[in-house]
Regions:
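PLP-dependent aminotransferase class I/II
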Residues: 38-45, 52-53, 59-62, 126, ...
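Hydrophobic/aromatic ligand-binding patch that stacks against planar heteroaromatic rings
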Residues: 102-104, 164, 253
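Conserved PLP-binding active-site segment in aminotransferase class I/II-type PLP enzymes
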Residues: 1-81, 85, 129, 166, ...
Length: 427
């Protein structure tokens, strides 16, 4: 019998026409192997065409896109564009990956974490306004920016968030790193606020191997972002700088991959939605397992980058008695790089034992299954940071997990995954 392949959460998937290789080869053939060039320019135009489109075919937007070396770089430059400086405060969704909040600290500013509401799992507008008013009372000034996050591709309550932001005159940086192609009321996420952030990491909806982009409201903002991304050089015949710049521009080689990927973006989005629909159907009668669905409000149109679910605390999983008995030796979830060794297998805020047992069981079935993001306000690095929460994101972290949804995940894979979940449950 052929050995079963590992089913990963979301793997990079190239176009069948091999266009990624074509454009990369062109970069080498013409010696455009620097962070500028024809591929970068064309990729930006392709992204603009997509970002400015409306699903109902109505009048298009006129946003501009700047390609960068990473989504994290885009968050960093967006905060600079919002005027964030040392000592300022930035309101950011707590239930997110660390790249949403770390750039705040790069600038010497302070993250103020905002909790989630239970339907989208994203920033709660009620808590957002509460945080704005309380920070103004405590510090005498308003926060400098608001950073909502499209968790696993789910649109945030952008209409309510923008109304609050406009009310207090605070710019919005949309972290749509996980939400490439998600829409609200037909409009692409990342095009509502002052800036929008996209990610093309190897596990995202499309990839450039590593990379990201910033959506800007106009050419003036895009030019400023470009200036900061290319070391902020002034117009002299020698190198002079009146501001601190960064080396954040995307490589022309990587942009070639992105150009090819744009030809399959809509196919990828459709596939992820199809996988989500299969999970919803196949898991609907599994007691204690609940797939996270988008709101019934038709304005919400998620890309379902990853399919997330929750596991009731009273569901017993095979091997649960051994959960957290051993210290993890390698990164969980396909993370690259080096992890810092720890002495204990547990922390004061972690997934329930049955969720950890399910992760281990699924790993034995060659299925990648990982916990949802740990809220940033519960991370040791942010100990003591202000937080406005109702506890929803902490509870979701205890019970939530992610399932494979990428382009390589077949219908049979989804059926196998669901059968494995059923097998894991002790009856």
């Amino acid at each position: 019998m052929e050995e079963r392949k590992t089913i990963y959460l979301c793997l990079a998937h190239m176009s069948e026409a091999g266009l990624e290789q074509k454009y990369v080869k062109e970069a080498f053939d013409t010696n455009w192997v620097v962070p500028m060039g024809p591929n970068v320019n064309a990729f930006e135009k392709d992204l603009e065409a997509f970002a400015n489109s409306k699903s109902d075919g109505s009048e298009e937007l006129d946003r501009k896109v700047v390609c960068l070396s990473a989504g994290t770089a885009a968050v960093h430059l967006a905060l600079i564009g919002c005027g964030v400086k040392a000592g300022d405060e930035v309101l950011v969704q707590s239930f997110t990956f660390c790249a949403s909040s770390h750039p705040i600290t790069y600038l010497g500013a302070k993250p103020v974490f905002v909790g989630s509401e239970g339907e989208t799992w994203n920033m709660d507008p009620v808590l957002l306004e509460k945080a704005i008013l309380d920070r103004k009372e405590k510090t005498g000034k308003l926060p400098k920016a608001i950073v909502p996050v499209a968790l696993y591709g789910m649109p945030y309550r952008i209409d309510e968030i923008m109304a609050i932001a406009d009310k207090y005159g605070i710019p919005v940086v949309e972290d749509a790193a996980e939400g490439m192609g998600s829409r609200f009321d037909g409009q692409v996420l990342g095009t509502f606020g002052k800036y929008g952030v996209l990610s093309f990491n190897g596990n995202k909806m499309i990839t450039t191997s590593g990379g990201g982009a910033m959506i800007c409201r106009n050419a003036e903002d895009a030019n400023e972002v470009m200036w900061y991304a290319t070391q902020a050089r002034d117009a002299y015949p020698y190198y002079q700088h009146t501001a601190i710049g960064y080396n954040y521009r995307m490589s022309n080689v990587c942009a070639g991959i992105g150009r090819g990927q744009m030809t399959v973006l809509n196919d990828h989005i459709a596939h992820h939605k199809h996988v989500q629909s299969l999970y919803e159907e196949l898991l609907k009668d599994v007691p204690g397992v609940h797939i996270h669905k988008q709101p019934a409000d038709k304005r919400y149109d998620a890309n379902f980058w990853l399919c997330a679910a929750t596991l009731d605390a009273d569901v017993k999983i095979q091997g649960q008695e051994n959960a957290y008995k051993e210290v993890i030796k390698t990164a969980v979830g396909g993370a690259a790089g080096v992890i810092h060794a720890v002495d204990s297998a547990t922390t004061d805020c972690q997934p329930n034992e049955n969720v950890e047992a399910l992760r281990v069981f699924m790993l034995g079935k060659k299925i990648e299954c990982r916990p949802v993001w740990k809220p940033m306000h519960k991370q040791p690095v942010y100990e003591g940071a202000p937080v406005y929460t109702n506890g929803i994101e902490e509870e979701l972290f205890k019970v939530g997990f992610c399932l494979p949804a990428g382009p390589y995940v077949t219908d049979d894979d989804v059926k196998y995954i669901v059968e494995s979940i059923k097998e894991a449950i002790v009856r």
